[in-house]
Design a protein with these regions (language model features):
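Surface-exposed peri-terminal alpha-helical interaction modules
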Residues: 2-143
Length: 143
């Protein structure tokens, strides 16, 4: 067995890598639910979004969707860590999981992400379901 095959096998079976992959998957589901919820609200006010490309441009550049950027950036950071060939450490995974826990805390009295997240949870059942899934994932032991 080649060295790269052994490294791949270690990466695939690492409990830390598996935990981070599961959390990433949950975050992507939450991110999608939030985008759909925001799209529906945006369209009620400004009219129909004509294409996926237009939606992508709005998500990246329109102030309406700016509050989602911390979640997008966290997914990118997890992707970069998972793509790195080195062995993950408990500390770096713990830091990322703490960031995820801190980010997905809705607050009626908060501002920025916390407040917008709270509002999305109030109006979109899909966001509630994705939030519950994330809470389950984050309550599982990492090792």
């Amino acid at each position: 067995m080649s060295t790269s095959s052994k490294q791949l096998r270690v990466r695939e079976t690492s409990p830390l890598r598996r935990t981070l992959t599961d959390v990433r998957h949950g975050l992507l589901g939450l991110h999608k639910a939030l985008i759909v919820a925001e799209q529906l609200t945006f369209e009620r006010i400004y009219g129909r979004i004509d294409s996926t490309g237009q939606l992508l441009q709005l998500v990246m550049n329109d102030p309406w969707f700016t509050w989602l950027h911390p979640l997008s950036n966290l997914v990118v950071r997890i992707d970069e860590l998972l793509e790195d060939g080195r062995r993950l450490t408990v500390d770096e995974v713990a830091v990322l999981l703490a960031e995820v826990r801190g980010l997905i805390r809705p607050s009626e009295l908060g501002d920025g992400f916390e407040r917008s997240y709270y509002e999305a949870l109030q109006r979109a059942p899909e966001v509630v379901m994705a939030h519950c899934e994330m809470k389950k994932l984050l309550s599982l032991p990492a090792l």
